[in-house]
Curated annotation (Swiss-Prot):
Spans within the Extracellular topological domain: 89-114, 186-211, 312-324, 424-439
Protein encoded by which gene: lite-1
UniProt KW keywords: Cell membrane, Chromophore, G-protein coupled receptor, Membrane, Photoreceptor protein, Receptor, Sensory transduction, Transducer, Transmembrane, Transmembrane helix
Domain of life: Eukaryota
Protein name: High-energy light unresponsive protein 1
Outcome of mutating S226F: In xu10; loss of phototaxis behavior due to impaired photoreceptor activity
Tissue: Expressed in the AVG and PVT neurons of the tail.
Residues on Cytoplasmic side: 1-67, 136-164, 233-290, 346-402
One Gene Ontology biological process: locomotory behavior
Length: 439
């Protein structure tokens, strides 16, 4: 007969295993319930519900609600008015001394805290513009993307769907925590608990209510930017999956025999329809995100320059201020990566699609040299080549990898200009001080 301790160990191990299985089944059941009970709501992919729940809580988007109540619409308008008010107020505070007077241009560039104030204002402006995009994101205009989703999601397993749901949940929570960290850092810097360089010197007219208002606006702005970047990444992923599926149809890995001309024409026709759906989905993404791509680069470039300038020009800087500047830089890098990499990948997948169109005739129809097939294939290849799948930023520049070189050169150029201005300013101040001492 085994000792009592062995019975106890067996009981505890069995109990732990049962609890783990119960929790895992409960989690799967909850995810399955969420994914299955919201089919009628107007969003592209059901796994995006965590992002849309975050937007619903922030009052930035109500696409997951079947009927928008008056209370939620009032809440959304209040959030938008708050973002507009705090953004204008923050820009008005740029270059303002604690006593309310304004700095001149030389004093502004010589003061790192004025630069950080400008960075705060740029973040709030980005959040305001992102919220405008999120208010209109959804409903019927996403229909081309939803059509592509139906084709790409039919081959996705339930396990892959749950995994993507958990990834989006993590991204939503991480975005909220990152935005909360920035808002809390800003508030504590204003009250002088931890940091000081993150905010401007406390203005005489600034109250606790104003600080809380700015902190909440900064939280909503940062969360809106992150959510919009995540949605852009997910929508671009729909296009990329559809492109890969079309390439596999055009150039299959295994083919026993060459099709007859009638079958070849039908296959080309089906591929043309699939490509047109992909192009329509790309047009929807460009309609929603073209201006977003433009101002994300227009905001992140000066933020990088100002933060580098602050780090180089600050005479004495403590570890907490270094951490705060690093947080700002990480935020800017994440935003740029989430907006840049998906667009680069779509451009490269589009180039592979052009190459596959040439291979389609030579490898798939190499035995039947039918003139009708050749003319139809030529038209299809011309269609792909003339309507390239490349996203643009308000038609000012196209999103490919060459833009990274322009980005780095712009950051370096503006940083060197600021640094040269700071060196000349310090030399002039030193000359004035020497002249005063000698006189």
């Amino acid at each position: 007969m085994p000792p009592p301790s062995s019975h106890s160990n067996i009981f505890h191990s069995t109990f732990k295993h049962t609890v783990k299985e119960t929790m895992a089944n409960a989690k799967k059941t909850m995810i399955a319930k969420i994914l299955s009970s919201r089919n009628k709501w107007a969003i592209c992919d059901r796994t995006l519900y965590p992002i849309y729940y975050l937007l619903l809580i922030l009052g930035l988007n109500q696409s997951i609600r079947p009927n928008n109540s008056l209370l939620f619409r009032i809440y959304s308008w209040l959030v938008f008015c708050l973002l507009l008010f705090t953004t204008l107020r923050k820009f008005n505070q740029v270059g303002v001394r604690p006593n309310g007077t304004r700095e001149n241009l030389q004093e502004f560039f010589a003061n790192p805290r004025s630069m950080i104030t400008l960075c705060n204002a740029l973040i709030m402006l980005s959040g305001l513009l992102a919220s405008l995009q999120l208010y209109t994101l959804g409903a019927k205009r996403l229909k081309p993307l939803k059509i592509l989703c139906q084709f790409s999601l039919n081959v996705r397993t339930k396990q892959a769907e749950r995994r993507q749901f958990m990834i989006n949940t993590f991204l939503a929570v991480f975005s909220g925590l990152l935005a909360l960290t920035m808002a809390a850092t800003y508030a504590m810097s204003k009250w002088g608990y931890i940091l000081y360089i993150v905010g401007t010197p406390n203005l005489d007219t600034e109250t606790i209510f104003c600080v809380l208002l700015d902190s909440y606006a900064l939280f909503v702005s940062r969360a809106a930017i992150s959510a919009l970047a995540i949605l852009f990444y997910q929508h671009c992923s729909v296009i990329r999956r559809s492109i890969k599926h079309l390439i596999n149809e055009m150039v299959p890995a295994e083919q026993d025999e060459c099709p007859l001309p009638e079958s070849s024409l039908q296959k080309i026709h089906d591929c043309q329809i699939s490509y047109q759906r992909i192009f329509n989905g790309k047009a929807v993404i460009e309609e929603y995100y073209s201006f977003v791509l433009f101002y994300s680069y227009g905001v992140c470039i000066p933020i990088f320059c100002f933060l580098m300038f602050v780090g180089m020009s600050a005479q004495s800087i403590c570890w907490s201020e270094v951490v705060s500047i690093v947080i700002w830089i990480v935020n800017a890098i994440l935003v740029l990566l989430l907006f840049s990499l998906p667009a680069f990948m779509i451009n490269e997948d589009g180039d592979r699609l052009v190459a596959s169109s040439f291979r389609m005739y030579h490898e798939t129809f190499h035995e039947e040299r039918d003139l009708t097939v050749l003319s139809q294939m030529t038209f299809f290849t011309f269609q792909i080549h003339s309507t390239k799948l490349t996203l643009s930023a308000c038609n000012y520049f196209y999103m490919d990898r060459s833009i990274l070189l322009s980005l780095f050169s712009a950051i370096l150029t503006y940083f060197l200009i600021l640094w040269e201005f700071d060196i000349k300013n310090n030399q002039s101040l030193q000359n004035i001080a020497n002249h005063t001492i000698h006189t």
